[in-house]
Amino acid sequence: MDDKKNEDVEMRNFNGRSSPSQRDPFISKPGAAKRGGSSFDLSNVTNSPGISILAYCLASISMTVTNKYCVSGSNWNLNFFYLAIQSVVCIIAIIICKQAGLITNLAPFDTKKAKTWFPISLLLVGMIYTSTKALQFLSVPVYTIFKNLTIIVIAYGEVLWFGGSVTPSALFSFGLMVLSSVVAAWADIQHALYGGGATQTKEAADALSTLNAGYAWMGMNVFCTAAYVLSMRKVIKKMNFKDWDTMFYNNLLTIPVLFVCSFVFENWSSENLTKNFPLETRNNLILGMIYSGLATIFISYCSAWCIRVTSSTTYSMVGALNKLPIAVSGLVFFAAPVTFGSVSAIFIGFVSGIVYAWAKVRQNQSKGSVLPTTQPVMSASSQSNRDAAKA
């Protein structure tokens, strides 16, 4: 998911906090490994910034590639079922890790918290479903580029509801994100219409129809993702969730919703199941579905690991830089069209991610260096929320 959809997966699993108390029970602390007489010291690996960054990048790329592989079959139409299997595998993995003592800060299931969190889970279903549909119709590079538009919607949502602000450098990065999306769409449409050197044909019309469906799903995903992130931010402060609690409730509460949606809206006839799971690729597809569930754990682990041994600043820059290999993976593994337009769009999107990460770093540094002697400017709705909280 996802991102994949790796961005979707991170938002699905983690609440964005990175306090050591929430990460350390799962990731070894520096010096925690035993220093015996053996030549190999595990702490050299667990405390290596380079290895943690590489692991995070590989986990993100593998998640995106796996999701694209699973949903890109010519007859695939069981997206709800696929996402349900992901959540089931993730929950099983969390329970096993807890029983093995790898996760020690997962609180027992609370029915009251589940009821409060359930609306957020419904928004999550909308986010991950539209994400897989967009990935099904669009190439990985185009999907990755358009995913940046979510950042813009979330940023202005924070301005409206949480009193956030948009700096000039962030605004410049938003312009680059929009430009990269326009260039990517133009390159995609040009390749669909004239990629074979011919003029408009039935095949070109079908390809254009597929792209239009992908853009429609991508647009819905942008707003579903923003709604999920902003709503989660508003509710999570009341829940006192730790990172693994967020992952557990998100995946557990979506399981019944996804299965019900699958049984109601998807075709479960034997003929359709055979089309979705053809004999020649059935085993690989099942393995991919299982791995995609485990990959949500891997990405969450690698995210916390990367933040622990580097810094949140480095992690944000790695996330921006990671856009490039994810987009390139689509060119390598799925034969996405390599044209001047597509390469230019990838490059512009890559630069926009770096500029945005740099803008956020500067904004955070300026906040930390200025004493809060005045009341910050905020929107009316944000002020009313703050006044209500004080009441």
UniProtKB/Swiss-Prot annotation:
It is a multi-pass membrane protein. Residues 1-28, 369-391 are annotated as: Disordered. PANTHER family: SOLUTE CARRIER FAMILY 35. Residues 1-44, 97-115, 165-170, 231-245, 306-313, 360-391 are cytoplasmic. InterPro entries: TPT_transporter (IPR050186). It comes from the Eukaryota. It is found in: Golgi apparatus membrane; Cytoplasmic vesicle membrane; Endoplasmic reticulum membrane. GO terms for biological process: GDP-mannose transmembrane transport. It comes from Sclerotinia sclerotiorum (strain ATCC 18683 / 1980 / Ss-1). The chain crosses the membrane at residues 45-65, 76-96, 116-138, 142-164, 171-193, 210-230, 246-266, 285-305, 314-336, 340-359. Glycans are attached at N267, N272. Involved in the import of GDP-mannose from the cytoplasm into the Golgi lumen. The gene is vrg4. The keyword Endoplasmic reticulum applies. One of its GO terms (cellular component) is cytoplasmic vesicle membrane. This is GDP-mannose transporter.
